[in-house]
Amino acid sequence: MTENKTKVKDLAAELGVTTKELGQVLKDMNISAKTSTSVIAQEDLPRIKERVQAQRDGGARKEGNPDVIVRRRHRDGDRASARAEAKAPEQEATAAMPETSAPERAEEADKPAVAKPAKAPETEAHARARKEPQAEPVKARIIRRPDEPAPVAKVVEAAPAETPAPEAPAVKATVTAEAAPAKTVEPESERPQADKPATARVVRPATPDASAVPDGTSSAPTLPVRSAEPSDTVERADADADGDDDDAQQRRRKKKRRQPEAVVPQVRVISRPDPAAVAQQQMQQQAAQQQREAGGYRPGGQRPEGGYRPEGQREGGYRPEGQREGGYRPGGAPRPEGGYRPGGPRPEGGYRPGAPRPEGGYRPAGGPRPEGQREGGYRPGAPRPEGGYRPAGGAPRPEGQREGGYRPAGGPPRPGGAPRPGGFGGAPGGMPVPGADGRGDQSKKKRQKGRRTVDFQADGPRGRSDDDVMRGPRGRGKRGKKDVRPAATQPLKAVKRKIKVDEAIRVADMAHQMGLKANEIIKVLFGLGVMATINQSLDIDTATVVAGEFGYEVEKVGFSEDDYLVPKEEDAPETLVTRPPVVTIMGHVDHGKTSLLDAIRKSNVTAGEAGGITQHIGAYHVTTKKGEIVFLDTPGHEAFTAMRARGAQITDLVVLVVAADDGVMEQTREAVNHSKAAGVPIMVAVNKMDKEGANPDRVIRELSELGLVAEDWGGDTIFAKVSAKTREGLDELLELIAIQAEILELKANPDKAARGHVVEAKLDKGRGPLATVLVQEGTLRQGDAFVCGVFAGRVRAMFDDQGRKVKEAGPSTPVEVQGFDGVVEAGEEFVSVADDKVARRIAESRAVKQRERELAKESKVTLETFLSRRADAAEALTLNLVLKADVQGTLEAISEAVRKLSTEKVKINIIHGGAGAITESDILLASASDAIIIGFNVRPTSKVKDIAEQENVDIRFYDIIYKLVDEIKSAMAGMLAPVQREVYLGQAEVRETFSVPKIGVIAGCHVADGKVTRNAGVRLLRDGVVVYTGKITSLKRFKDDVRDVQKGYECGMGLENFNDIKVGDVIEAFEMVEEAATL
């Protein structure tokens, strides 16, 4: 309260009236007060107090509508006097507030009781209507306007008059104000016990049941008021409109009221209900509760007491959901159950004078309320804040959801969980209206945070059908109350719990398909030990494991090259024809492999090889008397291990060449292992039988230790003794090869698409990338599209091993193919496909996979690798190289040999390697990376040489692999810093000491061993312990300075910065010598 102003609620408390009553008084006096917190001027207070007092005394009530008449009927004449005394206050209350709800009239009826405690029985009957126990169903008496037509009233039979009402225990009743139809107590006993004051005991029903709740329990603002006939005798209504006395007894219920704190009126219990009727009523309540929990919509036939309300009775139209957000129902008390509603539309709100009221204020009687008028507002005048002051002194209504609206006094909810239309309560179907508890929007945001939202209309009993949607705005009548579910928040689920994955899938894409947050997938990956980010790709195996964690399956939908490359069916036996055998010649270097092949081919391949050793793998087609044979010649040098392994993989038979005078060597053992790993049969050719020191028995013995036992020794390995020089035993060798091939039954289908392997590949300056391909099945023709490794192309030309151009190549035919996009890797599979598009797509798919593998191999610095480094590891030197070779297989061999040279002191780093001539880009790359260019069987052009000189790039050329390896070793050693080593010179014994001014102590010495030089380092030893290490400052023999003193001579010696020289000390001379470091 301010200095000269008073709030409405404070004045109401002071006068002992409700804010609603005070608000009506203020409006009648034309004093503006919209809410309970509005202030009143000090000068208006006296007039207001007089007006309120006048209304209390009954004068103010006569100013209201005189058309509403309150009549009571008693069956026995003993109550005639009580009815006469109570009639005046009733008429006054209804005259002043013609359509006031029951709690308001009850409150006004309380006021005379405050002034006059000894009230007549009728006035006490009003108090009993507020305070009788809820478990005692007593029906209210209904008033109406005489000018409105009276609908058919449902009759409620009273208890037999002969039954006296038992006395109720004295219990204090709580009165809470709530707008409800008028309700007065019907006396059910002929002997009212006026002399025994008692307070009604509030009894909550065991189970609030919808079936037992009259429809009158809907909040007053939206329910139309029924009128009774204007006669002196008003029949009581029956809940089911069938006149059943028992049902009427069961459906009558009393409501608890909150007593004004100022007065505790005493009431008198007229009658108690029949216990059997109460038990039946509770059973009906439980049945209705189960029906409501089942979610069923309340059919029209289940409408409890109160009767059917035609749709035309409720003016104002259907109020959409959300108009009453957060608002409390003024009056606070539970509405009385089961009373008749006086005829005519009952508007929402508090006092309704005849004059129209503005929006948000008091509504004109019976007038329609515009939609949105009551949103969260305070009824009596203007919008009030949520949880604002509730008239009649009620306690704040607890928050929470309630089915069909929250009922503070323990009253049962509406049947079926439906809300009171327009009243404060839940949304249809028992869902809370957004913002109804003041927290709706905020809590919804919290629930929806971080989740996908799917809006859907639920079908079924509570859902809204398509017809409802097409119908548009719904009416306000009984059939207009359709349940509309709000937007439900739930994770978006895939229609089919499958995700489609190509070869790999990003974490973000996977999360999108599964309807999850990427963080959830990353959590699972962390649990699997995979450190992933949202943009990281997962292979199909990892994706399958992760999807399984969430109950999803993985479906591979990407491009699969197997559909085009893998044969769909086996070759029929009738389509197979005999093919020539593929024979690989293997053995140690210089054991005569190529010479043997030359003798068979009657050619001279060896003469053209650098250093007389084979450094390429060659494929040759030879026609012999025994048939056609394809030979593969492999290098024997240790650097060509991969090349030998590749030859063993694509061959049918291995001929192991061993020199008779040299025996089994290292590469011989390696060749045996490669052949066994490939599962290829081995035939041994003991070469160089023409030499004097030839010992074939030694070879047979050594090979038997490797598991190759000769047939003469009881084994199954074929041995042939040959001489490439004299051609001895060659025919026998070819015959044995033919027999072995016949045993193997080598066949192939020449009518299918060609398939083979690349034996060797190179880059020719004029013809571009070339590859030697050994066709293993099918027929390769000029113009065919093919895919090989990460490259695709079309066969432009083919050449045989003699350099002749051919149009087609059948099974077991080696050809040189022109038409590649790049230099392929030796050993790659060569496959002919239908067209160029398929070939390019397969090549692109392989290129992507190869790039992913290379990126995955890149080593990243981790804590383990960082700590595992040695302290001096950072000082290790690196030799950068750019390798260029004539063919791909040789490049592979050189790269492997050079990598093996790396040591802890010097690392070899191959910046780039390729087949073909040295180009300008190679020079620029070497200049940028400070590298040396190694050329093997390649030469640069004059222009490339000029650029190399300008960029100061060193280019080295080699044609023999072991020379290349030796020079790289020397270069690595030259990068190391020289090592200093101490060299002992001699010793001298101190025999005398001399002290020379300004010079110091001079030692007179005798050279006992070696010599002492002027620039040498010295150590002074005393009793075998080093006392001083330093240099000689002066060395003299007699008075002459000398450079050195030999053994047996005497000399004078001065030491640098040291004078503590004693007789008997030994001076040892030494010098430091630098030596080249080794790897």
Swiss-Prot record:
InterPro entries linked: EF-G-like_DII (IPR053905), EFTu-like_2 (IPR004161), IF2_II (IPR044145), IF2_N (IPR006847), P-loop_NTPase (IPR027417), Small_GTP-bd (IPR005225), T_Tr_GTP-bd_dom (IPR000795), TF_IF2_bacterial-like (IPR000178)
Compartments, as annotated in UniProt: Cytoplasm
Keyword Nucleotide-binding applies: yes
Disulfide bonds: none
Region (G1): 587-594
Bias-annotated ranges (Basic residues): 473-482
Comp. bias intervals (Gly residues): 419-429
Biased composition (Basic and acidic residues): 52-65, 75-90, 102-134, 185-194, 306-327, 461-471
CDD domains: IF2_eIF5B, IF2_mtIF2_II, mtIF2_IVc
UniProt xrefs under PROSITE patterns: G_TR_2, IF2
Domain of life: Bacteria
Region feature (G2): 612-616
Region (G3), start-end ranges: 633-636
Keyword Coiled coil (UniProt): no
Keywords, alphabetical: Cytoplasm, GTP-binding, Initiation factor, Nucleotide-binding, Protein biosynthesis
Family annotation (HAMAP family): IF_2_B
NCBIfam families assigned to the protein according to its UniProt record, in alphabetical order: IF-2, small_GTP
Protein name, entry field: Translation initiation factor IF-2
Native organism: Nitratidesulfovibrio vulgaris (strain ATCC 29579 / DSM 644 / CCUG 34227 / NCIMB 8303 / VKM B-1760 / Hildenborough) (Desulfovibrio vulgaris)
Organism classification: Bacteria, Pseudomonadati, Thermodesulfobacteriota, Desulfovibrionia, Desulfovibrionales
